[in-house]
Structure formats: structure tokens, C-alpha cells
Design a protein with these regions (language model features):
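Lipid interaction determinants
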Residues: 1-63, 69-127
Length: 127
């Protein structure tokens, strides 16, 4: 994964682990996380310090809903999301399919106070 600034310069890149699923019925789901996330010291899913919760939230993205495909874009119609502001949104992704790899790129989005575009390469797993 890499993110680029408004001027096209690289902002950040790094490995992410996750799944992107598209069903033949028109539903999609995506969950991915940065590598090396720290476990909560307490081991309690509702526990954790404020800092642990912030780090956990900032290192994970998840949403699901319906999808629509056009010639060069796929639109995710978000129904559930870790980030509540995305619920009900229609988010467009530019796509490129090559062999067993799908590259999705976002238009500019507000991330950490900056306008960034994200580019993720997904690899097909066993059919």
C-alpha cells in the first residue's frame, strides 16, 4: 500500500495484511491492518489504554456493503464501517486488473489532516 499527496509525491508506503471480498450477489467487504500491531496489555477486547485504542483504530480499516462496477471504476456503497462517517457513503475506486492482482486507487481523501490518495494491490487467494 502507498499513499500519495495532492501533488503526487509519495507520503507513505508499507505492507498491509487483509482481505477484499466481492460476491456475485453484489456485496463486498474489506478489512486490512498494518503489520506489527501491538496487543492490548490487558487482553480484554473492551479494555486497553487510550493509547492502545488509538493505535488499534489507526492501524485498521474495515467496511462492507454493496458494490457497482463501471468501465474503469468500482463504487463501494458502504453499509457498515469501523469509521462511522463512511456509513451511507458511495466511495469510488479506480481499478486495474492484471493476472491475479487487482489494484485499487482512491480519489483524494482527507486523512490525518492531509488530502491523500491511496493505492492498494490485492492478490487473489485460492479459488
Amino acid at each position: 500500500m502507498e499513499t500519495r499527496k495532492e501533488d503526487g509525491n509519495l507520503h507513505r508506503s508499507g505492507k498491509r495484511t487483509g482481505y477484499l471480498i466481492y460476491s456475485s450477489e453484489g456485496y463486498m467487504s474489506v478489512s486490512f491492518m498494518k503489520a506489527g500491531r501491538t496487543e492490548f496489555a490487558s487482553g480484554d477486547i473492551r479494555g486497553g489504554s487510550v493509547e492502545e485504542k488509538i493505535e488499534a483504530f489507526n492501524g485498521y480499516i474495515s467496511y462492507s456493503g454493496r458494490f457497482e462496477v463501471s468501465e474503469d471504476t468500482v463504487t463501494h456503497v458502504i453499509e457498515v464501517s469501523l469509521f462511522p462517517n463512511w456509513i451511507g457513503e458511495r466511495q469510488e475506486r479506480y481499478y486495474e486488473l492484471s493476472n491475479d492482482r487487482l489494484t485499487l486507487s482512491t480519489p483524494l481523501q482527507l486523512v490525518g489532516g492531509m488530502k491523500l490518495s491511496s493505492h492498494l494491490v490485492w492478490e487473489k487467494v485460492g479459488a
